[in-house]
């Protein structure tokens, strides 16, 4: 059984493991190889543990009783934006292990993040996605409209990225209804 729920402190290592595995898979030919090799589960676990303690909007796809399945299969995070130029809320992360993709977990995690943002009072949402990430079509499929482009500094390089938005946020909630 798989459930989508708020992250707990005990999930931090599992979230970090998903982060490392998905980045090394999805960004193998996008981000610098040495940067991907340097990703540390223990360092990221501390980062996510801190976020969970602060009550940030971290959600997980957790497996219970699934044979040979890791305890955390995917995760998402969402926060209220300080400046709100692109939207009032940002889906900062959304990652699902390769072996568990195409099962609706990404949609469920994105919906959990959108619901969290509405609870914070956000009326719109956006997500930055690396331009060469094949999953960018997932956001379009769920009604995201490309609204901006730019770069982000990762591993000593400027990496192109694009922003998808749902304004109003109900356009995302309705797609998942």
For each feature predicted by the language model, list its residue ranges.
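Extreme N-terminal starter segment of soluble prokaryotic enzymes
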Residues: 1-3
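Acetyl-CoA-dependent GNAT
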Residues: 6-12, 17-101, 107-112, 116, ...
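Structural motif
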Residues: 18, 120, 141-142
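Residue-level preference for beta-strand/loop junctions
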Residues: 70, 87, 121, 158-160
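Short phosphate-binding/catalytic loops that engage adenosine nucleotides
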Residues: 105, 122, 144
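Conserved GNAT acetyl-CoA-binding A-motif
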Residues: 117-128
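C-terminal "cap" of GNAT-fold acetyltransferases
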Residues: 126-136, 140-145, 149-177
